[in-house]
Amino acid sequence: MESSLKIKDIPQNERPKEKLLTYGAESLSNSELLAIIIRTGTQGENVLQLCSRLLSELEGLNGILDASFDDIISIKGIKQGKASQILALAELFKRFRTLKAINNDIKITSPKDLASLLMGEMNELNQEVLKVVLLNTKNIVVGIKDVFKGSLNTSVVHPREIFKQAISKNSASIIICHNHPSGDPTPSREDINITLRIKECGNIIGIQLVDHIIIGNNKFVSLKERGLI
């Protein structure tokens, strides 16, 4: 039966590692690429089947990037070792994405510039994530950091965590950005209150909050453009 098919029982030219060596990494599916990282399956399920189910349960690559250790380890067949491998891979991807933005000297001249930079990543996240985008005196991105995950409110969003990142990079100004998993980027009263609190703290320490961008389903709202900050 297919459910008990082992990798060694799959024709050699169809195995992920052999396909990569023969045709290149770009020829592999997401589950095949992940299978090369994870390497082994579980009883009654080979590594390809495990990775396919993992991607399905986490709703794709965006889900993996958004997942916590507890999210991953709750999936049948995933133990600490495999969960650690997946989290390490996700973190490397996040760091590469940030380095790419920094090395390309991306300049933010409008809310659309920032939305274009982050929308692909944040569009399909399953929970709210608040990022701080760090800018130099020329409005060029020098860093992008995740600072909070989960439902955002003034009791959990601490300005010190945001400005700690800015100070460490000698940032002249910052933009904060978060997503609404509902797909509707309309700012809530809590969103506005958080923004005003961060703006006030920035004024005190001399690091300007330029804007707060909220991303929904292929659309965004700038609180600055709406006159809310």
Curated annotation (Swiss-Prot):
Binding site for Zn(2+): H178, H180, D191
Keywords annotated in UniProt: Hydrolase, Metal-binding, Metalloprotease, Protease, Zinc
Entry-linked Pfam families: RadC, UPF0758_N
UniProt motif (JAMM motif) ranges: 178-191
Domain of life of the organism encoding this protein: Bacteria
GO molecular function: metal ion binding; metallopeptidase activity
All residue ranges annotated as the MPN domain in the record: 107-229
GO BP term (any one): proteolysis
Family from the record: Belongs to the UPF0758 family.
The protein's name in its UniProt record: UPF0758 protein Cbei_0490
Organism: Clostridium beijerinckii (strain ATCC 51743 / NCIMB 8052) (Clostridium acetobutylicum)
